[in-house]
């Protein structure tokens, strides 16, 4: 088994365990058992459970922003970009709602203790830089009022609004309604020229 394969097995097992249990309920023994990888090997790749969960969060968010950057590159039409990003979130939610549940669960659990709170704040700063790159790629946006706003602020606001709908529902054990996400797209489309 190659190193990448072992690391992927560990991450996949962690994804499944964190889906079923909270971060604090999950153990490295659970992950070792499910992945078939010995615990010392897990610690070789991930010195702590916090490091493992952080890597998992980072990979999920990185994939989201890579896809958003890909969408932005496909068209210069702002309204089309908005529609495509909202559609991407809807498809991701329908195909893999587990991703959002894990992100919400780990994020919430991390904020409960100082040691993990520091780690997640470092991670959010790193991810914010990825989001800024996508926002810079988005380019300046002219609002319907005529005011210009950076693509970074516009994209940040839209992603935050979509995330709020998704995570609020996930936290309540509900699946977000497609129409609620479409409304966010409509609001942002109406806000641009």
What residues fall within each predicted segment?
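N-terminal intrinsically disordered/low-complexity leader segments
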Residues: 1-5
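Hydrophobic/aromatic residues within well-ordered alpha-helical segments
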Residues: 49, 60-64, 85, 89, ...
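Helix-turn-helix
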Residues: 9, 13, 17-51, 55
């Amino acid at each position: 088994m190659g190193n990448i394969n072992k690391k992927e097995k560990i991450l996949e097992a962690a994804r499944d365990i964190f889906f079923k249990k909270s971060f604090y309920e999950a153990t490295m023994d659970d992950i070792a058992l499910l992945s078939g990888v010995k615990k010392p090997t897990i610690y070789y790749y991930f010195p702590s459970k916090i490091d493992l969960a952080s890597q998992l969060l980072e990979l999920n968010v990185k994939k989201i922003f890579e896809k958003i950057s890909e969408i932005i590159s496909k068209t210069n039409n702002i309204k089309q970009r908005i529609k495509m990003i909202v559609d991407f979130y809807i498809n991701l939610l329908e195909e893999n709602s587990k991703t959002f549940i894990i992100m919400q669960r780990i994020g919430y659990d991390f904020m409960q203790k100082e040691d993990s709170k520091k780690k997640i704040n470092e991670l959010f700063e790193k991810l914010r830089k990825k989001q800024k790159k996508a926002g810079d790629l988005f380019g300046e946006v002219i609002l319907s009022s005529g005011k210009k706003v950076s693509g970074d602020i516009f994209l940040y606001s839209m992603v935050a609004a979509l995330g709020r709908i998704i995570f609020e529902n996930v936290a309540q054990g509900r699946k977000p309604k497609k129409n609620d996400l479409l409304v966010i797209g409509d609001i942002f489309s109406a806000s641009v020229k």
